[in-house]
């Protein structure tokens, strides 16, 4: 799968997943334009992307494409906390 097709697949998959898990009473839905790639790489036939949306829900997604099996894996994470830790150099 080339980069363009992988990006499109990631955006479609995350938009669909997010819409299926949003609070239905809010009436909010997103589309591919509300999904963005934070980081992406390709090694041999495999691809991985870290993805987020414009929603303020703290969700973060990791998508991995296994080129051998032609399978896409989705991991969904929710940000719990962000802390600064001072490290002595």
Positions of PLM-derived features:
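A short, surface-exposed interaction/processing loop segment used at functional sites
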Residues: 69-89
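N-terminal non-globular leader segments, chiefly Sec-dependent signal peptides
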Residues: 1-44
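Amphipathic, interaction-prone secondary-structure segments
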Residues: 34-71
């Amino acid at each position: 799968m080339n980069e363009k097709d992988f990006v499109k697949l990631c955006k479609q998959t995350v938009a669909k997943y997010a819409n299926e898990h949003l609070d239905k009473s809010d009436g909010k839905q997103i589309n591919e334009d509300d999904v963005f790639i934070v980081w992406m790489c390709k090694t041999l036939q495999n691809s991985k992307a870290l993805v987020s949306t414009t929603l303020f829900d703290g969700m973060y997604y990791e998508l991995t494409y296994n080129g051998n099996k032609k399978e896409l894996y989705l991991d969904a994470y929710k940000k719990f906390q962000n802390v600064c830790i001072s490290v002595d150099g």
